[in-house]
């Protein structure tokens, strides 16, 4: 029983629909599109060092395989730009009898210059329940915004859209 307690704590965290991290204001919009941006200051790091570090990370993280087509689609060391098309699964829940997940597609743009790395994630789309009659497709704008993914009081995540929002924010934080 004592061995299960840490696992129960982790499960509760994953399903905590009132965590402020996921509530109002967690989704940023740019020109009507869901966009996540993060700027990293790396004092003393040259553009070439940052570029090679980020290029190595992107090449390792985004590799196509027989099921997914994630890949680096553009690179220009002179500009300091790397563009990636991401494709992976977001797993909402997994048990021996069921698997609830969605495929997420997104664009990730990395721009580097001396001492700074800027990352932008946008053009986010989902393909949910793909094995059942072709599944359903959604864009982030119609599925994870405050209006769709939060309750009316904006104090907790909505039952269905909320899981997409939570997992998308967690993916953004991982990147």
Give a label for each model feature.
Residues 10-175:
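Ser/Thr-rich, low-complexity intrinsically disordered terminal regions
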Residues 2-10:
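Hydrophobic h-region of N-terminal signal peptides that target proteins for export
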């Amino acid at each position: 029983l004592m061995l299960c307690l840490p696992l129960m704590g982790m499960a509760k965290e994953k399903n905590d629909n009132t965590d402020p991290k996921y509530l109002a204001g967690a989704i940023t919009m740019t020109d009507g599109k869901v966009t996540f941006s993060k700027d990293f200051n790396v004092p003393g790091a040259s553009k070439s060092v940052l570029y090679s570090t980020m290029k190595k990370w992107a090449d390792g993280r985004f590799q196509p395989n027989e099921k997914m087509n994630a890949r680096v689609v553009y690179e220009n060391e002179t500009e300091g730009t790397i563009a990636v098309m991401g494709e992976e699964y977001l797993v909402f829940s997994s048990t021996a009898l069921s698997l609830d997940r969605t495929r997420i597609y997104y664009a990730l743009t990395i721009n580097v210059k001396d001492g700074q790395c800027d990352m932008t994630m946008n053009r986010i789309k989902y393909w949910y329940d793909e094995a059942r009659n072709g599944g359903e497709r959604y864009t982030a704008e119609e599925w994870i915004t405050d209006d769709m993914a939060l309750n009316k009081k904006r104090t907790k995540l909505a039952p269905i859209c909320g899981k997409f929002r939570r997992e998308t924010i967690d993916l953004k934080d991982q990147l």
